């Protein structure tokens, strides 16, 4: 490990997420994938650990072709704590993603190594569930919101730096605890932007929603829009509404209407 990696004079990052990013299926994976590409481009050596320790194609091979070592398999799963301890002095930092994953690793890293930890929450779970509670009044959602609030603030307190994709989330965190080290970073999904586009948008037709339906708020948003808003639009404009996203439920699929 040391001879192979440190001889290159590059810093090594252990990047931990729930599984290898399925970058063509959901926004969180796309963001993760783009940041992995950026880290490699910036000269870091990246070791990627998916908490399910699965070899999933074509995604694992894509990372490996980028020069990222993916830690997977039953042998690695049984030795991950030993691996981290053995290589702690070779690693520059650990980048933990998502509260349900980060909470599995942060205590071991802080107690058994001197490594710096960056935590990226992807979204504030407690805020999302509290907003749903406000809509539904379901006390189970309030209980779940409080649970995630305790987890997320514990992680941010233990991490050396935390990131979220919006200033709204950062403001919410600082309203509760101004001392938390947290910043907003862009949900980075494109390598480059088109500066000049000759497309005549007046020729475009329809409305488009893009979002993975494994994320419940996306399904809620589409159902609400179709039932409450789209009929009002159709009274004035005969436009179509296109829904694009992975893992659509039967309820979402039932919205299909070619007419």
Residue ranges and their predicted role:
Residues 84-103, 118:
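Short N-terminal targeting/anchoring amphipathic segment
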Residues 22, 115, 119-146, 171, ...:
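Acceptor-binding helix/loop patch of EC 2.4 sugar-transfer enzymes
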Residues 79-88, 196-199:
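Short amphipathic alpha-helix with an adjacent loop that forms part of the alpha/beta core around
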Residues 41-71, 75-78:
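N-terminal strand-loop element at the rim of the active site
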């Amino acid at each position: 490990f040391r001879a192979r990696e440190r001889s290159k004079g590059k810093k090594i990052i252990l990047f931990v997420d729930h599984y290898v990013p399925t970058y063509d299926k959901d926004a969180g994976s796309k963001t993760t994938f783009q940041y992995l590409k950026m880290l490699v481009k910036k000269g870091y050596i990246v070791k990627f650990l998916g908490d399910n320790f699965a070899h999933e194609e074509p995604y694992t091979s894509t990372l490996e072709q980028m020069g990222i070592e993916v830690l997977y398999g039953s042998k690695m799963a049984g030795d991950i704590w030993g691996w981290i301890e053995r290589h702690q002095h070779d690693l520059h930092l650990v980048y933990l993603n998502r509260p349900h994953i980060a909470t599995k690793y942060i205590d071991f890293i802080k107690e058994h190594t001197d490594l710096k930890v960056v935590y990226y929450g992807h979204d504030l779970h407690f805020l999302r569930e509290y907003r749903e509670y406000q809509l539904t009044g379901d006390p189970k959602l309030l209980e779940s919101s409080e649970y995630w609030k305790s987890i997320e603030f514990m992680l941010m307190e233990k991490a050396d730096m935390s990131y979220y994709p919006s200033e709204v989330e950062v403001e919410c965190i600082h309203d509760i605890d101004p001392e938390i080290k947290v910043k907003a970073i862009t949900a980075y999904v494109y390598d480059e932007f088109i500066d000049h586009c000759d497309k005549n948008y007046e020729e475009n037709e329809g409305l488009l929603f893009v979002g993975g339906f494994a994320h419940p708020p996306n399904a809620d948003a589409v159902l609400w829009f179709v039932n409450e808003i789209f009929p009002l639009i159709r009274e004035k404009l005969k436009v179509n509404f296109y829904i694009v996203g992975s893992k659509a439920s039967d309820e979402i699929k039932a919205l299909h209407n070619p007419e």
